[in-house]
Structure formats: structure tokens, C-alpha cells
A protein has these predicted regions:
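Residues at the starts of beta-strands that form the adenosine-phosphate
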Residues: 29-30, 77, 123, 141
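Conserved catalytic-core segment of NTP-binding enzymes
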Residues: 99-176
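Acidic-aromatic/histidine active-site loop/patch
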Residues: 1-3, 55-61, 65, 92-95, ...
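P-loop/Walker-type NTP enzyme "switch/lid" segment
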Residues: 7-10, 36-105
């Protein structure tokens, strides 16, 4: 079994990417998608089942419902478990996650948000907003999401490389996650190119024009 953990400062981006990743992984083997935190966009929304599911993840952890009860079958290759409907209903423990990942016969498990300390063997991804590149992250990999059409990743080369983690690329507004998922699954990491001398000179000249003309 291979486990993926997807984290982000923006809930809707995380849920959408987690769903897209699970949909891709199911082509290679049976996949379980698990959400641990409820937000304005949830995994069940992407499958058209909002308000149609009785049990959630906390019900399983508190023994209110069995694994089969909380597990929603999307198709023969993909099942999912929704986040607790009531926030702070249950504090997730390492023992909870260990028990959960032993359930069923899954080749892949995708967590839509999870504390990385709760599971040992995993591949983790952090989704970064265009103008909010952090100084550091705990996750293995990261990518920039929702960048504008005029975004030039080369201008952010120093910040990206200073994070010291694997960079999967950037996603422009309105584009899908196919390229990022390809890079993630194939361990293809993006090396941000340098600006050429003439490009730097041109940018300085443009800045000078803006200031003095």
C-alpha cells in the first residue's frame, strides 16, 4: 500500500487536488480517499453526494459505525470516507490511522489533510498559493496553485529553492492538475530555470521606465 497525504492552507484546493489524485490512482489499483477536515468544499461534493451520506470518519474512530458503514463506494476501484460533519468530534491519533490503513485491500490511500506525525510511511504534498510561498514546509513535495497568466516562476527561483523540498511545478488559474500528478507519480521534479542576463537587463530597464517616465 502507498499512502499520499495532501495538505494546504486553502481547503478547497486541497480537496480538489486530493480527489483528482485519487481518480488517477484508481486507474492503477483500488484506492481509498479519506478526508479529515470539513470545509466549504468537500470530497463528497466532487462526487455529487453532498448531504447523501450518513456516517463520517469520526463515527468509525469512535466505533459508532463500522468501516463498511462509513466507506462510500464510488465505483469498483474507488471508495471514500467523508470528514467529520461536526468539527472537534474526535481527535485523531496514530492508533486511529494505523487501524484505518489496515482496513480493506487497497493499493493506494489518499488523505485529504493529515498531521504528518500521525503516519510514518507516506508521500506528502503541500499546495502553495502564488503569493504565499512559505519559508519552509514539512511535506516532501510542493507546487504552486492558481498562478496568473503573467506569472514567471523564474522570478521566484530563490524562494522556491530555499524551501529545500521537491518542486512539482505550477498550475495556472483554470488549468487542471494532470501535469502535477504526472510529476508526483513519476518522481519528476521541476528545476526552475535562471533568467538570462538580457532578460534581467530588460526587466531593470522596464522598472526604470516605470519609475522615471
Amino acid at each position: 500500500m502507498k499512502v499520499y497525504v495532501i495538505n494546504s492552507s486553502v481547503d478547497k484546493d486541497r480537496a480538489k487536488f486530493s480527489t483528482c489524485l485519487a481518480n488517477r490512482l484508481k486507474e492503477k489499483g483500488k484506492t481509498l480517499l479519506i478526508s479529515t477536515k470539513r470545509s466549504e468544499s468537500n470530497i463528497e461534493d466532487f462526487y455529487g453526494k453532498d448531504g447523501m451520506i450518513t456516517y463520517d470518519l469520526a463515527d468509525y474512530f469512535t466505533d459508532l459505525a463500522s468501516f463498511d458503514d462509513v466507506c462510500v463506494k464510488e465505483d469498483d476501484k474507488l471508495n471514500f470516507i467523508i470528514a467529520p460533519i461536526i468539527s472537534n468530534k474526535h481527535d485523531i491519533t496514530k492508533e486511529n490511522i494505523e487501524k484505518l490503513t489496515k482496513e480493506g485491500d487497497y493499493k493506494y490511500v489518499v488523505f485529504d489533510k493529515l498531521d504528518l506525525d500521525l503516519i510514518q510511511d507516506k508521500k506528502s504534498v503541500f499546495i502553495v498559493e502564488e503569493n504565499k510561498i512559505p519559508a519552509s514546509i514539512k511535506e516532501d513535495d510542493f507546487f504552486l496553485n492558481g498562478v496568473g497568466a503573467d506569472f514567471d516562476v523564474r522570478l521566484h527561483k530563490e524562494k522556491i529553492e530555499s524551501i529545500g523540498k521537491n518542486f512539482l511545478g505550477e498550475v495556472k488559474l483554470g488549468d487542471g492538475f494532470d501535469k502535477i500528478i504526472d510529476n508526483l507519480l513519476n518522481d519528476n521534479y521541476v528545476v526552475v530555470p535562471n533568467l538570462s542576463f538580457f532578460e534581467k537587463l530588460k526587466m531593470k530597464f522596464s522598472k526604470w521606465q516605470t519609475l522615471y517616465l
